[in-house]
Amino acid sequence: MPRFRCAAGAALLIAASLVATAAPAQAHDINPADFQQVTLAKGVAEVGEPMAIAVLPDSSVLHTARNGTLRRTDRNGTTTVVGTLAVYSHDEEGLQGVGVDPGFATNRQIYLYYAPPLSTPAGDAPSTGSDWSAWTGVNRLSRYTLNADFTLNTASKVDVLDVPAARGLCCHVGGDIDFDAAGNLYLSTGDDSNPFDSAGYSPIDERTNRNPGYDAQRSAANTNDLRGKVLRIKVNANGTYSVPAGNLFAPGTANTRPEIYAMGFRNPFRMSVDKATGVVYLGDYGPDAGATDPNRGPSGQVEFNRITSPGNYGWPYCTGTNTSAETYNEWNFATGTTGPKFDCAGGPTNNSFRNTGLTKLPPARPAWIRYAGDAGSPPEFGGGSESPMGGPVYRYDAGLASPTKFPQLLDGHFFAGELGRGWIKPIHVGADGSVGAISSFPWVGKQVMDMAFGPEGSLYVLDYGTGYFNGDANSALYRFDYLAGSNRAPTAAASASTTSGQAPLTVAFSSAGSSDPEGGALTYSWNFGDGTSSSAANPSKTYTANGTYSVTLTARDPEGLTGTANVAITVGNTAPTVKINSPFNGSLFSYGATIPFSITVTDPEDASINCAAVKMTYVLGHDSHGHQITSQNGCTGSITIPVDGEHDSAANIFAVFDAEYTDSGGLTTHTQHTLQPRHRQAEHFKTASGVDPIGKTQAEGGETVGNINNGDWIAFEPYRLSNVTSFTARVSSGGAGGTLQLRTGSPTGTVLGSATVPVTGGWETFTDVTGTVSGAPASTGTLYLTFAGGAGALFDVDAFTLNTGAGPIVGLAGKCLDVAGGGTANGTKIQLYTCNGTAAQNWTVTPNGPVKALGKCLDVAGGGTANGTKAQLYTCNGSGAQTWAANADGSLRNPQSARCLDVSGNNPADGQQIHIWDCLGAANQKWVLP
C-alpha cells in the first residue's frame, strides 16, 4: 500500500486527518535509555514466518507461524514447538491468530484461528465461471488445551466458529483474537476479497460470471456474513458459544448474524480490546489508488479505528471521514460506467445479487485516524507504505510489583504499529476519545507484526522481518522492559557455522554481536543441548548422535544480569539446497507475462528429489511486504504474472519468485529471486548519496529525486541488465542541467549508458531523455544512476524505464497486436490476431513515445481524440497521435486523447479492430509489452 506524499499533505493533519475535539497534549518525552529491547527468539528456526502472539500468565509467549506451527518462548528466551496444525496455505491462508482464555490459569485453554485443509483443490481458482463449490472453504476458530508441559493437547480440540472463505484467490483472510474484561471473545476477520482488478478502488464487481471473491459486498457489506467484521461471542465451557447483549444486530433479526459487533472492514489484521474500557482499537488496511477519481472514488488511505460501540465502518462503500470526497461510486465492471456515490451518512445500500443480508446498511462511522490518500499523514507518522497494526492499550498498575513495568506516564496510551514504516507510536487518548500527542517508541527492528503487554507490564513485539511469506534471519520476538536508568541486561547474539548435517557434525559457535549497554566485560556460558557446555566465547562442538539440539548462549554482565540467545542444530539431516536457475535474480518483467521457471534441488539424505514436492510461488512485492498471488509445483514450469489492477502506477511494486522444498526429514529451504519492473520511480531507491526526495504534483508519484549535484547518485538492487538496450528517464531542470549515467557495481563503475539532461525551463517542467545501453554484465548486481555536471543544482529525476528491444504486444485472450496482412501502407488496419511471431507483430516500444512495427508507427487515425477512433499504421512523424504511455495496470494510453488502446467490443476474434476508448482498466485494454 505504498504511496509517497508531498510534505504539504502532512500539514493537513489536524484540520483533516484526525477526529479530535481538543487540542492534543504535548508528546511525552520517552527516553530510549530507560527501555531495553530484549531478543527472545530470532530467525526462521525460532519463529518461522511470524504471524501473531499471545502472552501467557507466566510471561511466556505463544506465537504462530503461517505454516501451522505453534511455538512457545519463555521469559529466558527458550523456544520450543508446542504444536502443529495441518493448514490450507494457498495465498495468505494458514495459521493466523492466537488467543489465551482469561481463565487460563485454571483451564489452560487457548484459541487458534486457521484455515483447515478440507478438500480444496490445489492451485488457483478461476476468475470466471459458474460453479464455485469446490473453492468454498472456511477459516476456523478452535479451542485447545495446553498440557502441563505447554504442548498442544490435540485431543482437546473443539471447533467454535467457522468463517466462510473463497479459496484459491488472494486476499484478506487474517484474523486476530482478544478478550474483554467480561471474558467475551473478539475476532477480527478480513473481507476475503481480491483487490487486484479494481484499479485501486472498491472491489464491487457484480458480473454474474465473475469469481465471487471480486465482490466485497458479499462479505464486508453483508450483514449476514462473518467476513470483514469484528465478532463478539462468549464461549461456553463445552465449546459452544452465546452472543452477549448489545452487538450490532439483536439475535433473531432477519438477514443478520448476531455475532457481528462491528462491520465494514477491509483487512483489520490487528486489533486489541482495552479491558479497562471495552474499547476496541483496530488497524484497517486500505486500497491503493494513487489519486482520487470522481468516477470511482478516493485515493487509497488506511485507518486506525477506535470502536466504542457496535457500528458500521463503511467498507467497501465509505472510507476515512465518509464525506463525499471519501466515498466510492457505484461502478459497472461490465461496461466501465460510473454511478452515484454511496450514501454513507444515511447508510449505504447493498444491491449486489450476492448479498444475503440487509439491503440498507447502518450509517457509516468515520475513522479515528486516517492517513495517506489526499489527506496526507500525521507528521509524526513519517512517510512510506501504509500498513496499520492495531496494538494494545497500556494500563499502569500501581500495585503490580514488577521492576520492568512501563511507567505511569504511558497509562491509557494506545500503541499503534506500522509494519511497512517500521515504527511503534504510543498515542495519548483524550478523556473524550480524541487523538492526543503521538510519541515515538525506541524499538530497533524491521516490520511490526504484533504487540501485546505481558502480566508484568513489559511490551512484547513480533517482528515479521524482511522475507516474503517465509520469515528470515530478521524475523524475531522481542520484549521491551522499562528500567528507568537501572543497569540493563546484556544482549546475547549466537551464531553457528552450520546448523544441519550428518554425524559427526562439528559446529563452530560464535558470540559475535553480544554486547552490554553499559560497556561492561561479558562472560559466556554455552549449553549445547546434549548435557555438555562451554565457557568459551567462541567454542567448537562435535555432535555424534542424531537429533535436534537447542543450543543456548548466556551472556553475563559484571553485575550478574544475563541475556540469552539460541541456535537450533539438526544432526542426522542436512537442509536441502534449492537453486533457482530461472528466472534470473534481478531480471526485468512485464505484468501479464508468462515467466518460465527452473529449480534444482539437492539433498544429501534424499536419494531422489520428488519434483511434485518442489514449489515455486509468485509474490507481488509491495514496498517491504508482499501479497502471495499464485504457485506451481514442479522443478520446471511457468507462472503468469497477472496484470496488477490494484496499485497505483507509481507504487513500488515488483515480483518475487520463491522456490521451496521440504526434505524427508522435515527441513525446509526457501530461495528467492526478485524481478524488477521496466518502469520505476526514482524515489524508490535503495541507497543514495547527496540527494533528497522532493514533493511535486507534476511528478508521476508525487515525488522526484532532487537536490542533485555533481557526483550524487541513487542505487537500486537487484538488477540484471544484460538484455537492456536503452533507457528513458523523465527529468526536469531549472538549474544547470547535466548528464545522467547508468552504471553497475559501484557509483564509479563502468558507464553503460548516458543521456544529456537539458535545462527544461523549470523544476516542474518535465521531459524525457533517452540513452543507449551497452556492455552490461551478464550477472546480477546493483544498478546506479549517477549524476554529473557543473556547479550547483543540476536536475531532478522523476522516473526511469529500462528498454529491452522489440517483441510482441500481447492483449485480450492472449492474442497479439497485429498489422493487418503485414501491410506497410499508411492507414493499414491495426487488429487483434493470434500470435504468430511474424514481423507484423514485432513491435519496438519507446516509453512515452512511439510504438513501431514494419518501419512505421502505431497511429491514432487523423489525430482524433474521440472514443472509437481507429488505430492504424502510419509514417512516423513525432505527433501526439503516435505517442503512447504504458501504465502499471497494463493499459497503453495515448496522452493526446487521454484514451487507451482498446480491442473494440471486447471481442477476442482474429481481425478485431483496435481503436482508442476511455481508459477503464478492462481486460480489452490490458497489454503485455516486450
Map each language-model feature to its residues:
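Beta-propeller domain segments
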Residues: 30, 93-95, 103-105, 117-118, ...
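Secretory targeting and sorting signals
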Residues: 1-27
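Proline-centered linker/hinge motifs at extracellular inter-domain junctions
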Residues: 487-491, 575-578
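Extracellular glycan-recognition/adhesion modules and their associated mucin-like linkers
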Residues: 805-824, 839-865, 882-908, 926-930
